[in-house]
């Protein structure tokens, strides 16, 4: 899969986009082509881990082998969430379902992204024998989720900047643990 900036640019691979975050020209990266994902593969009986693989695989392409991607996803989600399958659902009635996204280690919905993002970074860093420093600036739970996800990384240092007196109470409590 190749990506380019919404403001027009050269094409980049998944690894380059992962590490860049935003395009140099200030645009957002978008895929060259949108993959077709079979909706029959996405149903209520699919685990969150399997769903993640179904959706991510076409966007990653051949930059991560299928068995390695499965391992990364399994390690990211299997031991870090209190709910089996990561996400829990509460059916109110036939037409209303509540999706609970607080089952991660910091109780923030951002755990879903961070618990996977850091192992994806690690995959490439280990192959290249490199280390990186991440700088996170936040007043909420992004920092807590990022710090928790980096705990298991041998290749990433994290520096989290919080504004004085503007940190959400829950984020502050999480940092103290």
Region roles according to the model:
Residues 161, 165-166:
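Hydrophobic, small-residue-rich alpha-helical packing segments that form membrane-like cores
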Residues 19, 53, 57, 115-118, ...:
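Predominant activation on well-ordered alpha-helical scaffold segments within soluble catalytic domains
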């Amino acid at each position: 899969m190749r990506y380019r900036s919404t403001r027009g640019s050269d094409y980049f691979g998944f690894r380059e986009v992962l590490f860049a975050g935003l395009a140099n020209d200030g645009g957002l990266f978008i895929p060259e082509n949108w993959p077709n994902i079979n909706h029959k593969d996405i149903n209520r009986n699919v685990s969150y881990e399997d769903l993640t693989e179904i959706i991510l695989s076409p966007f990653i392409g051949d930059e991560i082998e299928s068995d390695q991607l499965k391992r990364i996803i399994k390690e990211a989600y299997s031991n870090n969430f209190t709910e089996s399958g990561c996400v829990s659902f509460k059916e109110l009635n036939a037409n209303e379902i509540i999706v609970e996204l607080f089952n991660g280690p910091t109780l923030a919905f951002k755990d879903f992204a961070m618990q996977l993002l850091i192992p994806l970074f690690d995959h490439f860093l280990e192959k290249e024998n490199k280390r990186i420093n991440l700088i996170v600036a936040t007043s909420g739970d992004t920092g807590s989720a990022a710090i928790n996800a980096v705990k298991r990384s041998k290749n990433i240092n994290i520096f989290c900047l919080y504004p004085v007196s503007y940190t959400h109470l829950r984020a502050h409590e999480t940092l103290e643990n």
